[in-house]
Amino acid sequence: VGPGWMNKMGRWEQPYELLYKSYSDGCAYYGKLKKEGQLIDMTMSEFADYYREKKGVNDNNYNEPECALWRDILYGSDKQLFWYCDPYMRACVNMDQGGAIVDLRPYAAKLEWPVGIGTKHVQDASYPFLIQEKYRAGYFTHYAGEGTVRSAKLSYKGEEVDLCLCPTHAHFSQEGKTRILTLDPVTIEFRDLTVKLQTKEYFEEGSSNIKIERNILEMSDPTAEVTLNEYMVACYGTTEYSEDMSNITLKIDGPEEKEIHYAYKCREEGVVGAKEVSAVIPEIETRVSMTASDETAEGYVKEGYAFSPMFTLGYRKTISDKEVFAT
């Protein structure tokens, strides 16, 4: 909220008098607290200095994350988002899309990103993303191909369901230095099979790791097997358009090594038993990788093309009732 709320040009739903009173009352309340010594007002630079001191940044021991499990109360949608931010990354998990990661920024690179007249970024002060749902469309993409998102798909007898289509809610907890997001189970219905699945997401302090665990709680046919495809579609940039990805290298480490040097040719490689799949993005000094809890899973990498330029890292695994698979 700022003084712009008090303009008289009819931009807001409320009348000017109400907006003026609301803003004035707010300022008066903060002023009263300041006079009583209960509040200190700071510029953003002053607050940054205060934050660094309080969090231990100045003593080189800053690992503690900021965590916020947010629920929409303004519009009554009952949607939930979870924000996680530490010196290594910022991530956003969207429970309305089944616990998909819809924003991911690799702070570990600590990029020098000068902004202003005379620099490469005259106005754009955003830190580059690997995943950004709003700019790169997420699951509900507006062009051919997939938008950036970290999610999973379940397949059975030719049918496929993405967990992005399974809204749910989550509960936050902490064990030691690991923050845990436990999602309510979702039910996936195929033509002749029903699967009840629960997701847990683990954020380990100071590690730059996110572990996503899928637990098959129940199947209508206990003998059935479904294919789980854990995937991450990503690119890099700060706007709706990804930057030039020609220098990106996609790699599979395992019994057999595979590499794709990005050329927008829509190529794909896969290796059963892959130890790791990864992408190196030199322009933002970032390496992002995925590993699997089961050595029999197939790791794969996919290259994009001009009109759907994002790369994909993923693991495919056949799973059955009561099985747990983590990446």
Regions of interest found by a model, annotated:
Residues 1-2, 116-119, 182-187, 211, ...:
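Beta-strand-rich recognition/accessory modules
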Residues 90-189:
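Acidic-aromatic substrate-binding/catalytic surfaces of carbohydrate-active enzymes
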Residues 52-93:
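Surface beta-strand/loop "capping" patches
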Residues 1-49, 295-325:
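Catalytic grooves of carbohydrate-active enzymes
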Residues 79-83, 169, 178, 247, ...:
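Short, acidic/polar N-cap/turn motifs at the starts of alpha helices
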Residues 103-107, 186-197, 205-254:
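Acidic (Asp/Glu-rich), glycine- and aromatic
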Residues 72-75, 82, 164-176, 201-203, ...:
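Short, exposed beta-strand/loop patches in secreted or surface proteins that constitute
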Residues 36-39, 80, 187:
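C-terminal regulatory/interaction regions
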